[in-house]
Swiss-Prot record:
Its EC number is 2.7.7.-, 2.7.7.108. This is Protein nucleotidyltransferase YdiU. The keyword Nucleotide-binding applies. The keyword rRNA-binding does not apply. GO terms for molecular function: AMPylase activity; ATP binding; magnesium ion binding. Keywords: ATP-binding, Magnesium, Manganese, Metal-binding, Nucleotide-binding, Nucleotidyltransferase, Transferase. It catalyses: L-seryl-[protein] + ATP = 3-O-(5'-adenylyl)-L-seryl-[protein] + diphosphate; L-threonyl-[protein] + ATP = 3-O-(5'-adenylyl)-L-threonyl-[protein] + diphosphate; L-tyrosyl-[protein] + ATP = O-(5'-adenylyl)-L-tyrosyl-[protein] + diphosphate; L-histidyl-[protein] + UTP = N(tele)-(5'-uridylyl)-L-histidyl-[protein] + diphosphate. It comes from the Bacteria. InterPro entries: SelO.
Amino acid sequence: MTNPFLNLTYEPALESLGNEFFDPVSAATFPEHKLRFRNDRLLPMLGLEPSQVKDDNFVEAFGLFHGVRPFLALRYHGYQFGEYNPNLGDGRGFLYGQVRGVNGELFDFGTKGSGQTPYSRGGDGRLTLKGGVREVLAAEALHRLGVKTSRCLSLVETGDSLWRGDEPSPTRASVMIRFSRSHIRFGTFERLHYHHQTEQIAQLLDHVIVTYYPEVSGSNSDDSAHIAFFRVLVERVAKLVAQWMAAGFCHGVLNTDNMSITGESFDYGPYGFVPTYDLNFIAAYFDYGGRYRFGNQPAVCRWNLERLQVSLSSVIPSKAMTEALEDYEKIYLGYYITLIARRLGISSTLGDRLDPELWEKLVGQTLQCLAQSQWSYPDFFAQLRLNFSPSWRDNADLILENVDLLGADWSTWRSIYQQVLKQLPPESLAAVPTVLEQANPLTDLLRPRIETVWQAIAEDDNWQPFNDLVQKLQSGN
């Protein structure tokens, strides 16, 4: 039987731009190939029926790396913790291939942990198994929370033993396939700007617009398309950060080389979900100054856009980009309020019917109470989903009556929430439970849960807790 992955039509979209953007590389060979995760939910997007794709097909394509060539290690630079670093590039992965989904969109298969490249900088090019497990879990959790994100297509344990300073060593190794819209980063353009490659900047930008920004690719002139692209990118990034903040997600390392040009979450290795609403929460243990703390994500992503503005200034008028950036905070705040309101059961379609000041007041009071009380951030929204009753509209004292509301002015919050519910027409009030269910998963992905899953794997090679958690994260239960 032929391998469905090897029969896909791979497009040389990025490869066709020329070898200025990548280096051809080979995959490492591994002593073992154990499939630990396969994401059957992604297969229909590729026109594949999960029942027709065997585990061995995943291993052959994404563990043994048979059948597809060339593999491309992409070149890029980046600002890391605010300092420019020209010594970057794909150091432990490559672009495996690009395929069209059934919806006509182009998707990347990118590896992580597939061996050394010219950009490994002395590293072994490998991925720890724990790192792979963590990314699988985060991607599925973010997707269920409605956050635009890359996903993991497969995770193969390789049998290698790795030494890491931040993990008990030796530790197990893996190779992962990341499924995303693109692996072109802000840092891809920054590298071209650093080398004064104006023609290549224009070439890559036109490729990005045609491939990932069809809504602006039909503009009457290159200038108008380029300006429109940057405006849409600013909007995408602002909304993405709003999604992170509403989800309680801290990326961890928002260097410009970890920012996708499509406005999609990826490369969030040291991520963390906030246990409580704490703007000073830091996900990465090495973020000593708190540059990438939870509450600083909106500001640092705007800073990253400003760095990209410099790199694109040879192609896009700087004034036009500055004007686009002036809308960043407004877009972010408006979308963030909408998302928090949704987590409170109020859908965006109802927003036009509500008093906007009351809506903002509810969101503000909610966040203030969560910060003061230090109630578990995911548990608060889960309790709303589990306990909501239409009777709350008529009696504020009934709102979360079975939950101890301590440590903050919850009585004021109850009063405001009741006022909002009173504004809803009957059909909208009836829809609140559905909105709450869609917006608020019952299973969190806080660090203790991840560590429990990992300990079962590390100590007993027991993958059942991991599989159970993936299923819960995907379903929202």
